[in-house]
């Protein structure tokens, strides 16, 4: 099969981090990124392992058309004068094309683990004080369009004794507040889970690398399997509306054979677990470069199909499909690049719920929402309504329902009551639906400036800058 050039872009030299020209090309249904530095030679890496899926995602992304508004000037502190160019002048700079969907604040550099796969290389340093963090929260709350939510990260945020205070402060300014955690402190105390939920926490973003000891021993340096299960159980017992998203770092040969089991575990615990967000390993921070460890989003989607009886790779859409939900309660369109993330929803219902401390009944086999809903038709209608600044209606949803619908119509009317514009209504959706997603953060080897310019996950920094996730972790962190 002949080599086909897909598009040309810019990337980074992994050695000197200078911007260099790059191209994506297809060979035998695999897409590669190839680039050459005048000083350090040629580099090549796998970009996407399924060219057909690449084209499907590209078409579905164009269908939504949600990345049109350029929003960097509205950040309040744009880098309007180019010095070194993208991605070195982040602030956001005037070249950035997508609004902040999720804003991240690193509230500590300390950590109670030394994970071999930590992209942040966390473990030392001092914490910013509470007033510095609150000032960042205030600045982020003034971005326009306003971010959909905020995440406290690090390091390990639960090492801060004032985390509940920070959660409460953020909740007064943002509907959605989440904490990125390894779960060690959650496993120690159900009361701690209750304290953070009472303060206003929306969801714990829980590091969760697989089923059984082995993935944790390899990726985290110790067996944390019982810790993860206890963290989930403590939140189940303590929470009025418990919410956890499982976040597996996926490494080839370590836990890529457990993707199906992780999804099944999430579905079986859907009274607490609201989603799974697989993150193919990013080869930066403490993670050493080894091309044999590389996993791409298509690898995750095909594994989900091969390892479950209910999912197909084509059930997934670009992460921009989340705009259907987020914009309904006033958040910005999710304008990320179609190669950045994939998402699907499983219908799990809520019949397995029995309240705090009660037994959970056996749950029926999950079903992808695409079995019952023509998501592409709904997305086309959404894009038209967005362009006309109109709200999506229940009728718009019903027009997209497939004739084979076996679900109660009350479920659909409840699940897609998007016109309410209330965060709690959309949040309640995740008591009946389980999000299954994949988000692949870049490293210096597969870095693509076209993706960076459409990034929607941004760090808020004490100096006032707002920096795209992959630019921050590859270039700006520690500078």
Where are these regions (language model features)?
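Glycine-rich, histidine-containing beta strand-loop boundary motifs that form or position
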Residues: 107-109, 119-122, 154, 181, ...
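Radical SAM/AdoMet-radical enzyme domain recognition
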Residues: 134-151, 160-280
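Functionally engaged cysteine thiol sites
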Residues: 37, 82-93, 101-102, 111, ...
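Flexible mid-to-C-terminal extensions adjoining Fe-S/redox cofactors in radical SAM and related proteins
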Residues: 2-67, 379-479
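A short, flexible beta-alpha/helix-coil linker loop
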Residues: 121-125, 211-214, 283-284
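Conserved alpha-helical substructure of the radical SAM core
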Residues: 29-53, 58-191, 195
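Radical SAM enzyme [4Fe-4S]-AdoMet core and its adjacent flexible, acidic
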Residues: 238-428
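Short, solvent-exposed loop/turn segments at secondary-structure boundaries
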Residues: 129, 217-220, 288-291
């Amino acid at each position: 099969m002949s080599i086909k050039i897909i598009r040309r872009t810019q990337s980074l030299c992994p050695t000197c981090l200078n911007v260099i020209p790059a191209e994506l090309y297809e060979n035998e249904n695999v897409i590669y990124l190839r680039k050459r530095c005048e000083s350090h030679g040629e580099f090549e890496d796998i970009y996407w392992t399924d060219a057909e899926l690449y084209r499907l995602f590209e078409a579905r992304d164009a269908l939504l058309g949600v990345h049109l508004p350029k929003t960097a000037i509205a950040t309040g502190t744009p880098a309007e004068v180019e010095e070194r160019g993208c991605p070195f002048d982040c602030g956001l700079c005037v070249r950035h094309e997508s609004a902040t969907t999720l804003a991240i604040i690193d509230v500590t550099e300390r950590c109670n683990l030394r994970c071999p796969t930590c992209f942040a290389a966390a473990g030392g340093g001092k914490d910013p004080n509470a007033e510095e963090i609150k000032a960042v929260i205030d600045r982020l709350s003034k971005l326009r369009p306003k971010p959909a939510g905020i995440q406290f990260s690090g390091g390990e945020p639960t090492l801060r004794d004032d985390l509940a205070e920070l959660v409460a402060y953020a909740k007064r300014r943002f509907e959605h507040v989440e904490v990125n955690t390894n779960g060690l402190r959650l496993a120690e105390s159900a009361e701690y889970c209750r304290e953070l939920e009472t303060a206003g926490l929306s969801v714990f973003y829980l590091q969760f690398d697989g089923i059984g000891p082995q993935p944790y021993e390899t990726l985290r340096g110790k067996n944390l399997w019982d810790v993860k299960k206890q963290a989930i159980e403590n939140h189940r017992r303590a929470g009025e509306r418990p919410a956890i998203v499982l976040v597996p770092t996926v490494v080839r040969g370590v836990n890529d054979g457990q993707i199906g089991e992780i999804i099944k575990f999430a579905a079986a615990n859907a009274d607490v677990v609201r989603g799974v967000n697989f993150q193919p390993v990013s080869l930066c921070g403490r993670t050493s470069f080894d091309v044999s460890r590389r996993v791409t989003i298509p690898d995750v989607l095909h594994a989900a199909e091969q390892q479950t009886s209910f999912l197909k790779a084509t059930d997934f859409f670009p992460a921009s499909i989340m705009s259907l939900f987020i914009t309904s309660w006033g958040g910005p369109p999710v304008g990320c690049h179609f190669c950045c993330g994939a998402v699907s929803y499983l219908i799990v219902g809520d019949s397995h719920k029995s309240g705090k401390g009660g037994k959970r009944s056996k749950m029926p086999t999950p079903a992808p929402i695409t079995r019952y809903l023509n998501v592409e038709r709904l997305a086309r209608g959404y894009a038209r309504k967005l362009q006309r600044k109109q709200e999506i209606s229940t009728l718009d949803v019903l027009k997209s329902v497939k004739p084979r619908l076996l679900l109660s119509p009350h479920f659909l009317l409840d699940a897609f009551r998007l016109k309410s514009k209330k965060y709690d209504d959309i949040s309640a959706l995740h008591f009946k639906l389980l999000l299954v997603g994949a988000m692949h953060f870049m490293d210096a080897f597969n870095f693509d400036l076209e993706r960076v310019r459409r990034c929607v996950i941004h760090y808020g920094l004490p100096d006032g800058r707002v920096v795209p996730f992959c630019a921050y972790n590859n270039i700006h962190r520690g500078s």
